[in-house]
Amino acid sequence: MPFTPRPKQAEVLNFRAGRMGVVAVPGSGKTRTLSYLAAQLVAESDLQDGQEVLVVTLVNAAAGNFARQVGEFVKERGLLPNIGYRVRTLHGLANDIVRERPALAGLGDGFNILDERDTGELLQDAAYSWARTHAGSYQDYLGEEHLDNARVIGQEWPDLVKDTAANFIRQAKDFQLEPDTLRELLKAYGDSLPLAEMGLDIYEAYERGLRYRGAVDFQDLIRLALRALEADRDYLNRLQYRWPFILEDEAQDSSQLQERIIRLLVGEDGNWVRVGDPNQAIYETFTTASPDFLRNFIKERGVKPRELPNSGRSAPGIIRLANRLIEWTLEHPNPDLRLTRICARAVPSTVR
């Protein structure tokens, strides 16, 4: 079925160069619009040999959807699919960068990446071992109102330790904090921080397990890719030439490290489109990801702000309710709870 852009989608598709930030509501057709834009840039931009339009998204399912749709639009223009563009997840992109020059990240050529199942088992072993050797210490974390539930909490103690440690390790890696650095910071702090010490003990055991296997985990890929890009300017210049256009999906869930990687790849003169919905950020509660990176990008000098406000996914009543909830957060009597950020109102649309 031919793609007929809505007026707001057409505004996005007018992009030719520079930087653009797009706030897109659910059901606004952002994937289709971004896919069409990628194909349009492949067909109409003056790409040289070895250059590609890079589409970056968050998860594998979205990457597959983008690859299919961009391929369809490219074929409609009489071009061969899979030429002139690349679709990657952020972690897939980081893996490409590290695999190409592992020495820059301090790795050997044959390094392994543990999948989520293996890293989950490694973390569980480290956390459960710590919990067994600190079997009664959970009571130190209970307030008086929870003492009656101490027995139940004790039964759940190993899993509570594991979940807490997983969050600790995730955030430590996002902030590029190695166990040795954290240990020195804790010593310098002076006061006892039992929860931080627990997380650090398990972090150290987890990292020992990775080193024993000669492996890294998916969380390592982002920081190692950043290390590689910062270590070799010539390598970074080659990648900037390779990807003169970068289109970023789900930008509301970008972390500081992820944004730094893409900023480096874009450089001073590159072309960058970021699309996302700040109201749909799902990773900020348990990672360092934040929709503020997208909001602040849209406010930057020279960035073209655009919206995709037309939703074809929900009935008008549902959209009115969602908009009212957003208005309520803007007017909340507690100033600390007000949503005072860039957000888009959804507009019902029967056009798909």
Task: Say what each PLM segment does.
Residues M1-G29, L54, R86, D115-T119, ...:
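Conserved helicase NTPase motor core
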Residues M1-L107, N237, R320-N323:
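P-loop NTPase Walker
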Residues L37, N65-F73, L93-E100, D118, ...:
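Alpha-helical scaffold elements adjacent to nucleotide-binding pockets in ATP/GTP-utilizing enzyme cores
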Residues N60, Q280-S349:
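Conserved coupling/interface region of RecA-like P-loop/ASCE motor cores
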Residues G78-Y85, R301-K304, P348-R352:
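A short helix-to-beta-strand connector/capping loop
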Residues A103-D201, P305-S311, H332:
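ATP-hydrolysis module of ASCE/P-loop NTPase motor domains
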Residues S137-A150, A231, Y235-R242, H332-V347:
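Short helix/loop segment immediately N-terminal to the Walker
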Residues K173-T181, D269-G270, I326-L339:
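Proline-centered turn/helix-capping motifs that create local helix->coil transitions or kinks
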